[in-house]
Amino acid sequence: MSTLVCFHAHPDDECLATGGTIARASAEGHRVVLVVATDGAHGEVPQDLEPGETLVDRRAKEVAASAKVFGFARLEMLGYKDSGMTGWSQNSDPGAFINADVEVAAQKLAKILKEESADAVTIYDWHGNYGHPDHIAVYKVGMRAAEIAGTPNIFQMTTNRDAFRRMRDMAMKNPEIVSETQGIGDFDPDAPADDGNPMGEPESVISHRVNVEKYCDQKKLAIACHRSQITDTSFFLNMSDDIFKLAFGTEYFIKVGESGPARDRWLFE
């Protein structure tokens, strides 16, 4: 069996884009470790915080619950502050993850990679999939940490821009899908995202297409753990099983050192 370390930016990032891969790896008996870079302090603030409870407190509880759903063997928080989206005032906070010294942050992650004798680590693609500053920092720190630790396999999570476009065009022919996905037809995967680049990567550079339909129920359960960010009325939780599988039943990775196009492969082949 192998050890997989999943490095994410915020509590809840573990769910949608890599959750099926995590669930599958755990179910197959691999050791799976979650490392979260930031405290998620700049997410949605729920109305039901207890006296003295902060959003950071709540999100720490939520990610711990999600980790149990997925079967993580270990959860580590690096303790950096959430940087917020591009242009937010929080970007200038000295404690924000985007302002961390890459070498220092990478040493923290590398320590975990070494402790775990990690066979593989997941991070994000070069622009954080959709340009979020903290996601881009995960890429930079993750790449350096893997180099320091000698982790042999690096998988960069991404969105298949071409597959998303095909799904959108198909969905537009089905009113039920349009309704359940809250206007998917209005989303243009080729439009500039938070950093000015389109979301994800083209199919031609993606190495791994992972079918995780079998684990979509676990993904939903883990998403539901993050109640401060995703309410009962969220379309994520109210999609029919078939449409959820259509939208989130496949996950995509670029394995460093390998090329596309995307094809059906498992991380531990």
Predicted regions located by residue number:
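Metal-dependent de-N-acetylase/amidase catalytic core
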Residues: 1-5, 90-91, 95, 99-269
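Active-site rim/loop-helix segments in enzyme catalytic domains that contact anionic ligands
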Residues: 1-117, 144, 148, 254
